[in-house]
């Protein structure tokens, strides 16, 4: 399960984080699944200074950084594409291959 210091501004101790299979460096909390529209609404908690697996989004994805620093990397993992701070929102296009993770204190993001 992802660990890291909680922000004094956002207390996630009461969130029931779950692992996602054998994937390392992240935990999730599923908020809603809309099967008929293929939409999953969830929170992701990224461990500090770690990257997750390379992946592509199957649809445009709305993302909001709730806490911490969310770092997006090129698929090689060597180069940083973007660093997004608390409060930053954006849309990831369909098919965009990347890896991502938390900054110094990790990150919590809302993804739809």
Regions found by a protein language model. Give the residues of each.
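Histidine-centered divalent metal-coordination motifs
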Residues: 55-57, 98
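Short acidic-glycine-tyrosine-enriched beta hairpin
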Residues: 35, 70, 74-102
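A short mixed-secondary-structure module that forms the rim of ligand-binding clefts
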Residues: 52
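A generic beta-sheet turn/junction motif
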Residues: 35-37, 58, 104
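A short, N-terminal "cap"/entry segment at the start of jelly-roll beta-barrel domains
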Residues: 1-38, 81-83
